[in-house]
Amino acid sequence: RSDEIRLGTVHEVIDFNPVAVFTPGNYIPHFFPGVKVALFHGYPINKRNDHRDDHFTIRGWFDLYCTQGPSSTLVFEQLERKCGFFRVYETGWPKADIYFSSEMQVNARNVRPTVLYSSTFTRSLTSAPLLAEEIERLLVARDWNWIFMFHPKLTDPDILDRYKRIATEYPNATYVGNTFDVTAMHKADVMLCDSSSIILEFMFLDKPVVTFRNSHPGPYLIDVRRPEEVGPALERALTRPDELMREVRTYTMFHEPHRDCRCSARVLDAVDDFLERGHVGLKRKPLNLIRKWKMRRKFHYWPFPP
């Protein structure tokens, strides 16, 4: 936006002297001024099926973790008691605010059912190469509209070009690309996906999801293992079975119970509270000398002391 200030260097950040620095990742330059606030990239769904979800890894960078709901808060509160050098505030996820607006919660009135196909960028989990042929068949066999929207990190030109070509050849297909488009999510009646974190975000709109070989299938999904099962699964999802939709609502509430569009405001309130009283009684953060050296090397910032 024209009224925003963009800081392009470490020195500009330091001169700006922020009260707080927010990041969706799991690291932050320790030499930036202000309270270090973790907002998270997504929810703890552990899509890669790792032994321990990196969502909960504590590296000693942050003063404040703004958690989303019970799925993250309960674990972080345990870590807060164990570590003692940060505070946890359950605020809800700022990005969730867009999904619970009155405009987004009203379903689009589609003449024909609309399927949003989205896929993760993770090579071992992406369904894009495996489902292209079946999706093309369904474009002919079913009276459905399709929207193709991929994760921004999915950059394989062969995959993207194939779906671009499909969209140009079939009038009932639209290619959005490897970008996030909330409008496309609002237009869709159902999502077809694999193990992308966007599944949960789509469910915030109270819509069903069909997955292909999901890494953590549950009763809130219709998961299939073979391409030929996709069509019947989508047909079932479009009927919005009561049991499925109950599971969807329970699952989303566990991750994100804050539906008042004030998650972003609560984050700012959390920073104010931390500055006023939340910092009292905290231990010092770990020295992290090696990590700090690596951080300075990454940003080419060498003033001392570290």
Predicted regions and their residues:
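Active-site and donor-binding regions of nucleotide-sugar-utilizing enzymes
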Residues: 1-101
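Short acidic-hydrophobic, aromatic-tinged amphipathic segments that line or gate anion-handling sites
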Residues: 4-10, 173-178, 221-236
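Donor nucleotide-activated moiety binding/catalytic core segment of transferases
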Residues: 8-14, 156-203
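Hydrophobic/aromatic beta-strand patches that form the interior of the parallel beta-sheet core
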Residues: 22, 37-38, 64-66, 89-91, ...
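A donor-sugar binding/catalytic signature common to diverse glycosyltransferases
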Residues: 26-40, 178-221
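Conserved catalytic-core segment of nucleotide-activated headgroup transferases in glycan assembly
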Residues: 89, 94-164, 259-265
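C-terminal amphipathic helix plus adjacent low-complexity
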Residues: 238-306
